[in-house]
Amino acid sequence: MKLLTHNLLSSHVRGVGTRGFPLRLQATEVRINPVEFNPEFVARMIPKVEWAALVQAADTLNLAEVPKEPTEGYEHDETFLRKMHHVLLEVDVLEGTLQCPESGRLFPISRGIPNMLLNDEETET
């Protein structure tokens, strides 16, 4: 699971609502998978990223590259875009869990795929 994906996921356990984001990341296996650098794509994604959640996830994985906020004029800052490309697209969580901050529900990550399926009693009716 890429950190870009993590930044888009939230818990939909009954009664949680918007308090199901960001999911707490606990990784037991992480791999770096090189991906071709596309500065235009990264620049388009930066405004869509929930920055505090990205910083929290990066801190959990001991990734020091993530600044506390995007740099001014990041669209033209290749160094910044390369760092964010690495963090968002090349860091791959293969095994671990995601935890709902409100309910505490754990969602497993297996072979890079987060399982967000809920039991019937956990869903809204």
UniProtKB/Swiss-Prot annotation:
GO terms for cellular component: nucleoplasm; perinuclear region of cytoplasm; protein-containing complex. It is found in: Nucleus, Nucleoplasm; Cytoplasm, Perinuclear region. Keywords: Cytoplasm, Nucleus. GO terms for biological process: peptidyl-glutamine methylation; positive regulation of rRNA processing; rRNA (guanine-N7)-methylation; rRNA methylation; transcription initiation-coupled chromatin remodeling; tRNA methylation. Residues 2-119 form the TRM112 domain. Abundantly expressed in the testis, also expressed in the brain, heart, kidney, liver, lung, muscle and spleen. GO terms for molecular function: protein heterodimerization activity; protein methyltransferase activity; tRNA methyltransferase activator activity. Belongs to the TRM112 family. Part of the heterodimeric BUD23-TRM112 methyltransferase complex; this heterodimerization is necessary for the metabolic stability and activity of the catalytic subunit BUD23. Part of the heterodimeric N6AMT1-TRM112 methyltransferase complex; this heterodimerization is necessary for S-adenosyl-L-methionine-binding to N6AMT1/HEMK2. Part of the heterodimeric ALKBH8-TRM112 methyltransferase complex. Part of the heterodimeric METTL5-TRM112 methyltransferase complex; this heterodimerization is necessary for the stability of the catalytic subunit METTL5. Acts as an activator of both rRNA/tRNA and protein methyltransferases. Together with methyltransferase BUD23, methylates the N(7) position of a guanine in 18S rRNA. The heterodimer with HEMK2/N6AMT1 catalyzes N5-methylation of ETF1 on 'Gln-185', using S-adenosyl L-methionine as methyl donor. The heterodimer with ALKBH8 catalyzes the methylation of 5-carboxymethyl uridine to 5-methylcarboxymethyl uridine at the wobble position of the anticodon loop in target tRNA species. This is Multifunctional methyltransferase subunit TRM112-like protein.
